Amino acid sequence: MSESIKVRAQRQAHCKDCSLSGLCLPLSLNMQDMDALDDIVKRGRPLKKGETLFRQGDTFSSVFAVRSGALRTFSVTDGGEEQITGFHLPSELVGLSGMDTEMYPVTAQALETTSVCEIPFERLDELSVLLPQLRRQLMRIMSREIRDDQQMMLLLSKKTADERIATFLINLSARFSARGFSANQFRLPMSRNEIGNYLGLAVETVSRVFTRFQQNGLLEAEGKEVRILDSIGLCALAGGAMDA
């Protein structure tokens, strides 16, 4: 990976001891199979905010599971403009989209101090042949990525600014809840500008919508801290929110 962070193997953490194992690749694996997966996982020092895990155009070699913190992925257009393609929370995999062309089509960058597990794809592929449950979990993850892409297309083509941001917040709420955090009170790892870029909205529009949501009693927001006051109302506004 050019100018990227190489994650070197350290054995200070194990899949079987990780609180996220029920959401990540080890889902449904028994202890012996989990040990086999753990043997190929590499763990290294945390990424600092703004550090790059891999860059658009780098040779595809590994997928990465977020252990703590958060990443954003983005592509750069021919005109040099960044387009954010996703935000990735603990237990979520990053890098699978490079499998087809054997190059990463996006850049992955830390939004805050972030730890990841590196999983060399060749070894993961070999192991998945031996462990059908691991192969099925990989297929589930890829299926979810396809579903998320389809939902994002619908979000950008059909919904108003209020609906887009409501859907975004409900989706984040569900993802935080699945990880054992509060569904109604959380800190956004991304900026308003990054939310706008992702949702196809101007940052001024994002700020106005947050203000309107507060005036309507849907939530409280101070900086990146968000407290949802009316989850039912927010879900209704989303008009069929995305699943976690």
Swiss-Prot record:
NCBIfam families named in the record: PRK11161.1 (NF008365)
More info: Possesses 4 cysteines which may bind a metal ion (possibly iron).
GO cellular component: cytosol
Domain HTH crp-type: residue ranges: 159-232
InterPro entries assigned: cNMP-bd_dom (IPR000595), cNMP-bd_dom_sf (IPR018490), Env_Response_Regulators (IPR050397), HTH_CRP (IPR012318), RmlC-like_jellyroll (IPR014710), Tscrpt_reg_HTH_Crp-type_CS (IPR018335), WH-like_DNA-bd_sf (IPR036388), WH_DNA-bd_sf (IPR036390)
DNA-binding region(s) from the entry: 192-211
Protein name per UniProt: Transcriptional activator protein FnrA
Keywords: Activator, DNA-binding, Iron, Transcription, Transcription regulation
Record keyword Transcription regulation present: yes
Any one Gene Ontology molecular-function term assigned to this protein's record: DNA-binding transcription factor activity
Domain of life: Bacteria
Organism: Stutzerimonas stutzeri (Pseudomonas stutzeri)
Biological role stated in the UniProt entry: Transcriptional regulator of arginine deiminase.
